Structures are given as structure tokens and as C-alpha cells.
Amino acid sequence: MYLFLALIIIALHILLLFYFGYTLIAVFRGAPPIPSLSSTVKRMMRLAEIKPGEALIDLGSGDGRILLAASKLGAQCLGIEINPLLVWYTRIRACLSKASSVSVRRTNLWKVDVSQADVVTIYMVPIFMQKLKEKLQAEMKPGSRIIAAVHPFPDWPPTAQEDNVFLYRIPH
């Protein structure tokens, strides 16, 4: 019995170390995993004006709440997340929610091709917003939309804004 409890405690410690290790990586490569408030997610979905069948990519998808909200609107959703624990957590949530249009890939967001996305959602720390703006403007098709939570892009006025959520459109 004591051996079993000791093994559980050791396993929990390993999982915590694993999680915090990937959190540190995320901090230095984009943003720490901070879940968006449900009110922010609702504003993001309103501004995105998602139509059934559109492709949404969430860069830094965390626990998948944006993916699940967009899938309810009919979007085909792809989450990009570097933390494997959050990838599996999102996959489990999607399965339990019967959200078959949600998939998640464990990879670095800077390596992802976003050219097929109709909508990209982000919640990124300010120091990476300029680099991300350049990537999205270079790769996304004209007319596609970007929804940024909390931090706007520098030197790019949003098309629309609702509180701390910003809508950008790739020009035609």
C-alpha cells in the first residue's frame, strides 16, 4: 500500500516537473499557458464571425477552450501547442465533448503554415507580436481574419475591437 502511494506521489511530481518545464519553454518562445476568460472567448468568437466549414487555427491553444467554442460554430479547428500535457488534455476534452472537428498538434507555432486558415486566434506576449504579425501577413490569404486577445499588433490598427479583443483582416 505504501509503495503504491509512493509511486503515485513520484508520478505526480514527474508530471508537475514536466508541465513546468514546458511552461518555461513557452514563456521564452511565446506566452505562458494562461487560459482565456470565458468572456474573452465569447468576444473572440463574436469578432471572428466564424461560418460553418471555415478553418480556424489557434496558435498556442493551451487547454483548448477556443477550439471547442469555435467547433460549436461549425469551424474545422486545429490547435497548435508545444506543451504535450496540454495537447493531451485538449484531445481528451474534445473527445468528451464529441468535438470531432477539433485536432491538436504538438509543435512550435513558428513552424506552422497558416496559409489555409480562414481565422487565426492568438494570445501572445507583446514582445513576439511584431514577429507574429510579419508571419501572419506573409502567409495568410487575403480576407482571412486574425483575432488577438489582450495584446494588439504594433503598427497595425485593428479592423474592429471589443474590449481587449482585436480583429485584423488580411487585405485583398
Question: Where would I find each of the regions flagged by the language model?
Answer:
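Conserved class I S-adenosyl-L-methionine
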Residues: 53-62
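A short SAM/SAH-binding and catalytic strip from SAM-dependent methyltransferases
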Residues: 115-131
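Conserved SAM-binding loop of SAM-dependent methyltransferases across substrates and taxa
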Residues: 63-75
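S-adenosyl-L-methionine
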Residues: 1-51
